[in-house]
Amino acid sequence: MFNMNLLSTPSSEEGSPQNRSSSMSSVEGKKDRDTFTNLQNEFDGKVFGVSLEESLKVAQEEVIIQKSTNEIGSIPVVIAKSGKYLKENALDTTGIFRIAGSNKRVRELQAVFSKPPDYGRKFEGWCDFNVHDIATLLKRYLNSLSEPLVPLALYDIFRNPILENPKINEHKEQIIKDYEDIYMLLPQQNRHLILYLAALLNLFARNEKKNLMSASNLAAIVQPSLLSHPKDEMCPKEYEASRTVIEFLILHASDIIPNTEKANKDTMPHAGTVAKFNNITVPEMAIDSDEEDFVHPSIDDHMLPRSRALSDSNNFTIHHHHHHHHALFPSPIDFDNNGLSVPRSFKGRTLSAESLSPRLSKLLGNVGNSSNTGIKDPTERVPRGEHKTKHKQRQSWLRRLTSPSRTQP
């Protein structure tokens, strides 16, 4: 039986930010999930309901993506602003990201971050909203993206390190190394947003004893927006595998350093030095520089497709990283009709499949084989209408899976 009992969304009373029930009716849950689909015409369609690339064209903000490297990158304004507020005000809030906000207030926030010319960059009126409204806004943006953050062409490759190593803890270091390679196959803007979200959610996982939101619970909430594919939408086993991947990325947010960033980590000046000489302000980061890094709890004997969570709140260790700034690079692999086979030169370096780990090189060599990946065209994108239809089907499946009759022991 899958451990899905925390996926159901508790209710919220629209008129009272302070009085939240811990359980949500299926009618209210469906209303919240379908809000964007039903009301998308109220907004200009430049921030919500478009691709990440299109959204960044009108509303992006620079942030420090990873504490361990002080990598600076651009993410959507709505994610940067809501993430910053939640980090400062909601780390100890019970059920954060699980409890739904008020549809009315979330729509108001959505309108703010959809309105030109600043698209919410100057917004400071958080006092009229509560943390559940703001967390729901962040989720709504992710759920409205026209494609998951891991492109469909990389879906199988991105899951492979976990699927090949069912006993995750025994192969933890190798899995981390594989993801350091695989991250570099992502488009730069997708990589930056996933890294930021993993670091942000890592903070909430660290406070699981207070907010009751483990890395497993958080991964289940964001997984459909980060790592999903139409061919696996209605398969519980595949859903669980993808959730486990996202959980691993959250738990190891400070350990996984994409390879180009690692290569430049020891040669570039500290972010503060860059700010001093370039007269810039170092932007908000997901994890403050004075906070300790969270190292994942023990995950011994975790086996797929079993649903046992990776996290164990009774086993924590802490370590520290030195902070460096480094250059930014685009995704080194181009997409063409024959697969991921065209190396891209960047900053004087070329990253080819052969320069990656042997396992990843083998995967790249087979990515064009539809029998291996299930993808006929590696550049395929799910049409927006089909994506929304699949999203509704997935939510219907989740409601059935998390119904009281399915979740009771």
Curated annotation (Swiss-Prot):
InterPro entries: Rho_GTPase_activation_prot, RhoGAP, RhoGAP_dom. GO terms for molecular function: GTPase activator activity. One of its GO terms (cellular component) is cell cortex. The record marks 98 as: Arginine finger. Pfam families: RhoGAP. Residues 377-386 have a biased composition (Basic and acidic residues). Keywords: GTPase activation. Residues 1-32, 362-409 are annotated as: Disordered. Residues 50-257 form the Rho-GAP domain. Residues 1-26 have a biased composition (Polar residues). GO terms for biological process: negative regulation of Rho protein signal transduction; regulation of fungal-type cell wall organization; signal transduction. Acts in signal transduction. Activates RHO1. Interacts with RHO1. This is Rho-GTPase-activating protein BAG7. The lineage of its organism: Eukaryota, Fungi, Dikarya, Ascomycota, Saccharomycotina.
